[in-house]
């Protein structure tokens, strides 16, 4: 199938791929055509950022689809360093959850329940669109703004 990749500024290109290709492969093809290093690319489909390790079929990307390309500046990190502190907070949540589950389930059942919760959590995060993330960030950064429903955060 042929995908069209359109940078926010610049000329678009077409790439020939299969639906089983990984996003990282698409980035390599785009890198060859547009001279943009793969590590500086962020591909979006219908407002959702695509993860390198996932396949196009994971996002239901079909023939004639159009992907948007955001180019990161050369010196900018991919966000891994900035996520380290939030990552430790998340691991703290999973550790606390593990402790709570251990009080109510056998060790094997607690591990299964936690594994399923982690999978559900990660799936939910992958399904967030950029609009969803923007709304959530706005609500968290400006909780006192009028007209915003923040009751779900209680």
UniProtKB/Swiss-Prot annotation:
TM stretches of this protein: none
Keywords annotated in UniProt: Cytoplasm, Transport
GO function term, MF aspect, one? protein-folding chaperone binding
Q: Give the Pfam families listed for this entry.
A: Tugs (PF17840), ubiquitin (PF00240)
Q: Which GO terms describe its cellular component?
A: BAT3 complex; cytosol
Checking InterPro entries in the record gives:
Ubiquitin-like_dom, Ubiquitin-like_domsf, Ubiquitin_CS, Ubiquitin_dom, Ubl4_C_TUGS, UBL4A-like, Ubl_UBL4A-like
Signal peptide extent: none
The domain of life for this entry's organism is Eukaryota
**In which compartments does the protein localize?**
Cytoplasm, Cytosol
Fetch the Gene3D superfamilies from UniProt: Phosphatidylinositol 3-kinase Catalytic Subunit, Chain A, domain 1
Q: Which CDD domains match?
A: Ubl_UBL4A_like (cd01807)
Domain Ubiquitin-like per the UniProt entry, residue ranges: 1-76
Function per UniProt: Component of the BAT3 complex, a multiprotein complex involved in the post-translational delivery of tail-anchored (TA) membrane proteins to the endoplasmic reticulum membrane. TA membrane proteins, also named type II transmembrane proteins, contain a single C-terminal transmembrane region.
Subunit details for this protein? Component of the BAT3 complex.
Name the chain's protein.
Ubiquitin-like protein 4A-A
Q: Which organism is it from?
A: Salmo salar
The primary gene name is: ubl4aa
